[in-house]
Structure formats: C-alpha cells, structure tokens
C-alpha cells in the first residue's frame, strides 16, 4: 500500500484577547459613576489617601489600573509586610489593590500611609469590604483609615451590565441586537465577576 499523501496541517492562530484596562474600555453607569469621577479628578483629590470599595467584579481593579497608569503608581497586589514596606520606601504613588482579603501588617500599612503623606504622594486602596470590617487593632492606623475619603462601587446595574456585554461582543467583532442584550441582562447574575 502506498504511503498516504501529506495532508496540509492546520496552523492554530493565537487569537486570545487580553482584557483592556484603559479609560476608553471603561463602561460608566450610576453604579460606578462616583468612583470614575474620583479617578478622573486625580490629582485634585480631597486627600492623598483614598479607598474604593465594592463587590468582586465591580471594576475596582480596572479603575485602579487607570489611576496607576496616570499617576505612575507602584502597584502592590500582594500585601505581605515586606511588599508594603518596600513600596512605602519607594517614594512613589502607591496602589494597594485587593486590600483586606487577608492578614494585614498594620504597622507596615501605617508607615506606608505616613510615607506617602510625607512625600506628598498619593495612595489608593481597593477592597471588597469597608475598612470597618478589616479588624484593625492599631489605634493610629484606625484613625488614618477613618479619615480617608471612601467611595463605594455598587452592584452592577442593568446599564453597566448591558454596556459591558455590548463592549465584549464588539471586542469580538460581533454585532448584537439591543433586544438580545436586554433579554440577557434581564436573566443573568448581577455580577461581572
């Protein structure tokens, strides 16, 4: 039997898409409008230390990424004491993303807040919960945290869910009828996570 002719091989194309974290990629609705306004106002903030809190998938990290880019901030997303201490000594604007999800080195955080203030820099923290739920024990740190302006991102509303859905379809070059989006929004979970 003669050998089978060589078949043309199909070459896989890497068409993976990285999520966009630019300001242009951000969908704004009443659920996140106050937090977006805060990020857009920088560096004209009411204080140099701010907290944005909201549920998982609400866009905290997206907003923080926009701010970090604009502020040329050092991003600290693993909040071990060594990372916080090193960041505090950097003399940079700081972003602590996802704070309050684990054990907090209160002394390191206290010094980071003081260091950014002394250097006339900014510190933005994002968290799933309000600082009152972080079980902080250090009185001076509690005082600093309580004095920080805080902005909440609410659960995604229909406008935000629809906007994100249209954007995701558009990113994949899929034209979707608004009725389909409305149908999906009325039936999906109220989360972007």
Q: Over which residues does each language-model region extend?
A:
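Walker A/P-loop nucleotide-binding motif
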Residues: 47-64
């Amino acid at each position: 039997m003669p050998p089978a002719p060589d078949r043309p091989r199909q070459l896989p194309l890497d068409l993976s898409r990285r999520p966009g974290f630019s300001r242009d990629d951000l969908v704004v609705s009443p659920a996140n409008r106050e937090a977006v306004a805060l990020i857009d106002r920088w560096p004209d903030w009411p204080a140099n230390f701010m907290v944005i809190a909201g549920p998982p998938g609400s866009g905290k990290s997206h907003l923080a990424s926009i701010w970090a880019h604009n502020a040329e901030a050092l991003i600290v997303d693993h909040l071990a004491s060594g990372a916080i201490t090193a960041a505090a000594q950097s003399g940079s604007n700081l972003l602590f993303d996802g704070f309050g999800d684990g054990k907090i080195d209160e002394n390191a955080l206290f010094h980071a807040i003081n260091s950014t203030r002394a250097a006339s820099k900014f510190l933005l923290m994002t968290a799933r919960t309000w600082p009152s739920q972080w079980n902080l024990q250090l009185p001076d740190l509690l005082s600093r945290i309580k004095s920080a302006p805080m902005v909440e991102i609410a659960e995604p509303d229909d406008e935000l869910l629809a906007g994100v859905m249209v954007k995701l379809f558009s990113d994949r070059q899929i034209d979707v009828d608004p009725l389909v989006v409305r149908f999906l929004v009325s039936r999906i979970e109220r989360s972007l996570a």
